[in-house]
């Protein structure tokens, strides 16, 4: 491991000490794009340290010669070998070994799942923090057969859906369809009996027929919506074309969940408002929004941006489009922070998009074709000027507001009553600057501890309150691709699941990986203990970390840790590493072994890769507030 004994005097010394120097820039080949001059692109070659020039064909057919960019330009990597800064550039800047998970991340983003059955089943991983490569985005945009398939589906049945539709048990689906056929038969018989030619005429005959027609219309609307949904899922290759239609079964639910993941929707396979809206946009518009979201990831990572407008409850748009659904802009009843930072990510993404010549589906597809057929995937763009507070190193602190804390087990009647009354969810706020100049950069939903099952030494499982630490803490260790080593108190059943009808070990929960219990990034909460002439850091097992358990972030609790969406955790890690000094500690090998049992079966867990560690210098102060404990009189 490498540690700094004093601040480096030069960037060269920073590299030797494995300490990142934010001013350092990597030389290479990239495209130069000016947002002021519209869509101007040309190839530039660099021979470090002297900048070079080159001439190439510009977008639109013009030709020009440009110099290598200097002050005011941001280099954005749009290639397939890109990985987020914590998995790549942060260690590379210190000349250190790269995290082992980097190549796995790149493979997953390119749709190469190897032997990872869970990733292959998840398919679209953007919602879990792994945005697809632009080659995959372009392949979707170029799939005209898929677009025509979607175009042929009438929008009416889905637009008529007013309440969420969910998976229905097989028996209920069969009975619903039998009832539909019976109702159709009754209506047909009534039409023949009275010699009328339409259900509208039949409705007007008497109130009884009016009720019968209304029943038929409602049943047919449900059936038509399910069939239209399934047709869209077939177009996207998420369902088999010849599969039975008309029942919202498990197959449909899983296919819809994959559609939701691909289109940035927090869902579990239910047909809700966000999903209906997405289906109504059309496949070309959805692919354009996917391209813009991927560009947003790359731009925010390159520029080290974190400000998304959440601190003031005002999220910007990109090319007139709100790229995030309401659940990913969750703020609850909290008012805007007076010192909240404006959204910087959306304007930066729009500047990059316009500089690339992206304005609609056709121009974006053409731009991607040109970019990905060229010899370089790096572009240099002029982004909006940074605010005065944005400097490096940046004074930072974080506050976790626990919100309304329910102190009773939600499985009890009292706990359910308190949970329903709780309105303020836990939030994480990151501040920059000091005193009157302090700015709130983001305010994101998170979790705090709650009531969970715990295994005793006798192997008996009991319910216990797993609270979060309160008071002053510090983020010192930042870990990317962390593995979760379940404590002995974790019940064996929580480490097992059923797959293809068989009990299996939840390898993905252990990690490293996007489905790890710690997600793609974790920050350890240390308590500083002073002893006069020296101090030491205590680790109580609490972390701020990424997670794919998005529903828990919005409505649930944790075992004491503070969960974030994986993309938020990655963005936070990138921001910290680009705005603070740090030491590269590298991979930490720590052996973990445990036997997991259920009647007649046993599994052996073995891990030795705990994750890739960075040490923030100095640590970032974190204050975990008590929140407002919900209490009620016992009846």
Give a label for each model feature.
Residues 30-42:
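Bacterial N-terminal signal peptides
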Residues 17-20, 30, 46:
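Low-complexity, intrinsically disordered or signal/transmembrane-proximal segments
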Residues 25-27:
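Positively charged n-region of N-terminal signal peptides that target proteins for export
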Residues 47-635:
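N-terminal pre-domains immediately preceding structured catalytic cores
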